[in-house]
UniProtKB/Swiss-Prot annotation:
PTM (free text): Phosphorylated mainly on serine residues. Phosphorylation on Ser-299 promotes sumoylation on Lys-294. Constitutively sumoylated. Sumoylation represses the transcriptional activity and is promoted by phosphorylation on Ser-299.
Region (Interactions with DUSP26, MAPK1 and MAPK2): 245-323
Upper lineage: Eukaryota, Metazoa, Chordata, Craniata, Vertebrata
InterPro entries on file: HSF_DNA-bd, WH-like_DNA-bd_sf, WH_DNA-bd_sf
Cross-link (Glycyl lysine isopeptide (Lys-Gly) (interchain with G-Cter in SUMO)): 294
Record feature DNA-binding region, as residue ranges: 17-121
Protein name, as recorded: Heat shock factor protein 4
Length: 492
């Protein structure tokens, strides 16, 4: 049995050495346990060679346990630290399994230093449950200050909410006022500029193309009779033939707006429908009234519908008559061809002009002052066949029973007119004037001597129409070809 370790000094001192430190000092200094625990060569630390054997063989002799972990925990409680050597600090496990512990007051040969080794006393916890009076007073003051700031913030928030509500009400009121002002401004603009827009659009819609292709004006109100000036160039000759522009009839619907001859009666110093006379023109020529009779072909349904229409030229009064003849018949009459059928082409030869004939009275022409209907204004040779007949009337049937069996040409109409006089140098090269028929005699009515205006479409006669010289001809802008034939002689 091993000898008991050297007894630690037991003399009374100011502080006794703890039992664990006395046992450890004896254990390290025992030469019989140097193979398991010993001093280091420097004497400032001790080494444990084999931890497992040390725990099984040595610890039970000095301590009540054989647990190495408990031994190491007690060393740590007294301030011992584990020394890590260079060999143990590497990644490879060292060959020797030993542990080294070190304390500044645990040195070999200096036993008096053991009094300095003290067990670590855990720090006493402060009593948090207790509050000092000064701390409580300070905390109460801070809480009161925070409460005052909170009350001020709540009051400010309530004020901001009230101001926000007031602003929203003002915004709603301003929006309503803004919308009302917009509506008022819109109504004012509509009242101020609405008539102008309506007048401009109505004028644009009612604006008509000029009846004469080179000069003329338009009547602003085609629904009633107006006193409008006529071009000065047109008021010096009694008879005119002109190709009208398309869509000159205003009184008929779109299905009845077809082209046809226009016969116009120009009389001098005729009073206007409202009882006023025309004022003289700017050029010094006298204003002349113009009565227009437009002939429109029958509708496809076979019924000839007539309506009041107004020519694009400005006029005193305008009357539109139903179409008395078809386009083919009028073309045949104007060209002077007798053998004409509405269905076939024109292949008849030009007949020789007949001798002079007597001028029919105004009853025959239907130009009485009291009768202003379209049928009365047209000569009997241009009157329409009865509407009951389905077949179109031929040229000979239209001319009346007195002219059956012979051809009718415009030369007969030429013989009814008086002497012709050529136009002045200011007229167009294709215009011819007639002055004979327009001069009223002592036994004539002023209506009989009034000029007539025949308006024939350019599409009826092809490139040129062979017409007698008794009629003044105006060429269309599309075709400037001479309407007069080479054999026509404008001289009387």
């Amino acid at each position: 049995m091993q000898e008991a370790p050297a007894a630690l000094p037991t003399e009374p001192g100011p502080s006794p050495v703890p039992a664990f430190l006395g046992k450890l000092w004896a254990l390290v200094g025992d030469p019989g346990t140097d193979h398991l625990i010993r001093w280091s060569p420097s004497g400032t630390s001790f080494l444990v060679s084999d931890q497992s054997r040390f725990a099984k063989e040595v610890l039970p002799q000095y301590f009540k346990h054989s647990n190495m972990a408990s031994f190491v925990r007690q060393l740590n409680m007294y301030g011992f630290r584990k020394v890590v050597s260079i060999e143990q600090g590497g990644l490879l496990r060292p060959e020797r399994d030993h542990v080294e512990f070190q304390h500044p007051s645990f040195v070999r040969g200096r036993e008096q230093l053991l009094e300095r080794v003290r067990r670590k006393v855990p720090a006493l916890r402060s009593d948090d449950g207790r509050w000092r009076p000064e701390d409580l007073g300070r905390l109460l003051g801070e809480v009161q200050a925070l409460r005052g700031v909170q009350e001020i913030t709540e009051a400010r928030l309530r004020e901001l909410r009230q101001q926000n509500e007031i602003l929203w009400r003002e915004v709603v009121t301003l929006r309503q006022s803004h919308g009302q002002q917009h509506r008022v401004i819109g109504k004012l603009i509509q009242c101020l500029f609405g008539p102008l827009q309506t007048g401009s659009s109505g004028a644009g819609a009612k604006r008509k193309l000029s009846l004469m292709l080179d000069e003329g004006s338009s009547c602003p109100t085609p629904a009633k009779f107006n006193t409008c000036p006529l071009p000065g160039a047109l008021l010096q000759d009694p008879y005119f033939i002109q190709s009208p522009l398309p869509e000159t009839t205003l009184g008929l619907s779109s299905s009845h707006r077809t082209r046809g001859p226009i016969i116009s009666d120009i009389h001098e110093d005729s009073p206007s429908p409202d009882g006023t006379r025309l004022s003289p023109s700017s050029g010094g020529r006298r204003e002349k009234g113009l009565a227009l009779l437009k002939e429109e072909p029958a509708s496809p349904g076979g019924e000839g519908e007539a309506g009041l229409a107004l020519a694009p030229n400005e006029c005193d009064f305008c009357v539109t008559a139903p179409p008395p003849l078809s386009v083919a018949v009028v073309q045949a009459i104007l060209e002077g061809k007798g053998n004409f059928s509405p269905e076939g082409p024109r292949n008849a030869q030009q007949p020789e002009p007949r001798g002079p004939r007597e001028v029919p009275d105004r009853g025959t022409l239907g130009l009485d002052r009291g009768a202003r209907s379209p049928e009365n204004l047209l000569p009997p040779m241009l009157l329409r066949a009865p509407p009951e007949s389905v077949e179109p009337a031929g040229p000979l049937d239209v001319l009346g029973p007195s002219h059956q069996g012979r051809e009718w040409t415009l030369m007969d109409l030429d013989m009814e007119l008086s002497l012709m006089q050529p136009l002045g140098p200011e007229r167009s090269e294709t215009e011819l004037a007639v002055k004979g028929l327009n001069s009223p005699g002592p036994g004539k009515d002023s209506t009989l001597g009034a000029p007539l205006l025949l308006d024939v479409q350019a599409a009826l006669g092809g490139p040129a129409l062979s017409l007698p010289g008794a009629l003044t001809i105006y060429s269309t802008p599309e075709s400037r070809a001479n309407y007069l034939g080479p054999g026509a002689n404008p001289s009387p």
